[in-house]
């Protein structure tokens, strides 16, 4: 029995993450147990604990997987050495929206994060995790906007803190709206218009000036 447990503990984390994704998507994060995930993955709960301490770490793994494909663009826009930070942000947003529509796994994970991750009393750790992720994203957007101001791509009097909040709210809200009512928004066909709407807000809105 001990030998079997050790063998199962060597199961790849990717297999467990894939099972967690399916379980969370079907049942929601709060209603899914590690036993549910273990059954789908074909392993014991002990094998899950070998790689992940709890559901919060599995949710974080799903969130991290969303960032892998466009992390280089985010880092470029945040770098003071980047000559076209706003251009990098535009490419990043185009990639985010295109992947959301065209990649089924990306869509499922976003569906989990937006509509199937309930912040109940026993989900405090996941709530704190999401708060941390939002603050990290805010920091990255702020750096990118500050770089764009320095490069003359955005107004010098732009309030980058307020603008970062507005940009996050715009993108996150558009994603949430499309996931809820995909037929009401042509996110793929009008992707450049949707991205440029957000960027024009940064360039032109008097309410975002200091």
UniProtKB/Swiss-Prot annotation:
SUPFAM superfamilies assigned to the protein according to its UniProt record, in alphabetical order: Homeodomain-like, Tetracyclin repressor-like, C-terminal domain
GO MF terms, alphabetically ordered: DNA-binding transcription factor activity; transcription cis-regulatory region binding
Keywords carried by this UniProt record: DNA-binding, Repressor, Transcription, Transcription regulation
Annotated function: Probable regulatory protein for the mepABC organic solvent and antibiotic efflux pump operon. May function as a repressor.
Statement: the UniProt record of this protein carries the keyword rRNA-binding: no
UniProt-recorded name of the protein: Probable HTH-type transcriptional regulator MepR
Alphabetical list of PROSITE patterns matching this protein: HTH_TETR_1, HTH_TETR_2
UniProt keyword Phosphoprotein present: no
DNA-binding region: 33-52
Record domain HTH tetR-type: where: 10-70
One Pfam family cited in the UniProt record for this chain: TetR_N
């Amino acid at each position: 029995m001990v030998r079997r447990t050790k063998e199962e503990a060597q199961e790849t984390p990717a297999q467990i993450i894939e099972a967690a994704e399916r379980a969370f998507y079907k049942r929601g994060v709060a209603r899914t147990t590690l036993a549910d995930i273990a059954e789908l993955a074909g392993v014991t709960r002990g094998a899950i604990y070998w790689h992940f301490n709890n559901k919060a770490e599995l949710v974080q793994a799903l969130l991290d997987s969303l960032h892998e494909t466009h992390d280089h663009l985010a880092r470029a826009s945040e770098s003071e050495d980047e000559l076209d930070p706003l251009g990098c942000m535009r490419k990043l947003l185009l990639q985010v929206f295109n992947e959301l529509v065209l990649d089924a796994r990306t869509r499922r994970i976003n569906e989990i994060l937006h509509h199937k991750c309930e912040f109940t009393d026993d989900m405090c750790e996941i709530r704190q995790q999401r708060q941390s992720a939002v603050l990290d994203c805010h920091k990255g957007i702020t750096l990118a906007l500050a770089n764009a101001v320095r490069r003359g791509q955005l107004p010098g009097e732009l309030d980058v803190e307020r603008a970062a909040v507005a940009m996050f709210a715009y993108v996150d809200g558009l994603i949430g709206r499309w996931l809820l009512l995909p037929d009401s928004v042509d996110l793929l066909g009008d992707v450049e218009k949707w991205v440029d709407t957000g960027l024009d807000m940064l360039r032109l809105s008097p309410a975002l000036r200091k």
